[in-house]
């Protein structure tokens, strides 16, 4: 309870809504729904391909409206264990993944030139390169360049502002969740004074999807509860947590916003 009153002020906890891969449904359906309710989301984009400039151009307006643009790497390299094809993170290196991340960042910067705090999203929630005895975490790479990095997490657990490692904070994958499950997680975990981060991919899609009626019900709940549950971008809440950990002397990961 002390953590709730110390960090969250008049609110009981916080929620961030994150969206991966810069999908068309995010532009067509998610952004308008958020704007209608006065909510802001964090969108993690992949600036890859020869057409990346044209494809990402609409996101300039999204960023200008107050939504967060985040880095999801250039190549979206995940574990080769997902596909059975060699060439994934197991065969990568810290130098290679850092170069990939920084190339993506150079392409993303013009989309949101006003953003002074950038956050990162680990593709497929994988935070390593190499394998066996040569396996290494690339969380320190992310901590070097970003305010925060979104990883995976255990179901039913959020992030405690006093102790969360911002370079590898936890999130709840929302695919296949119904409205009451998402609302229940938001209600219970914020009641405990935690920061709840939801991960969305498709809305009404064929893969990693959430039904639009369930998604909108969550947004309506958060809009109604804005006085008791703070809904803000990852950069906003992570920035406040970083300051809170610094002034209270709590352990925190070094980062360069």
Q: Which residue stretches match the model-derived regions?
A:
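Boundary/entry segment of secreted carbohydrate-active catalytic domains
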Residues: 1-27
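C-terminal domain-boundary segment and adjacent tail
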Residues: 2-9, 41, 51, 146-163, ...
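Short, well-structured secondary-structure segments
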Residues: 14-18, 26-79, 114-122, 150, ...
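Short, surface-exposed alpha-helical recognition segments that flank or form part
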Residues: 18, 92-96, 210
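Active-site micro-motifs of SAM-dependent methyltransferase domains
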Residues: 24, 76, 126, 205, ...
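Amphipathic, non-transmembrane alpha-helical secondary structure
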Residues: 27-36, 56, 60, 64, ...
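Catalytic domains of cell-wall/extracellular-matrix polysaccharide-remodeling enzymes
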Residues: 29, 34, 50-54, 78-183
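N-terminal/domain-start segments enriched in small and hydrophobic, helix-friendly residues
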Residues: 60-65, 79-92, 187-194, 200-209
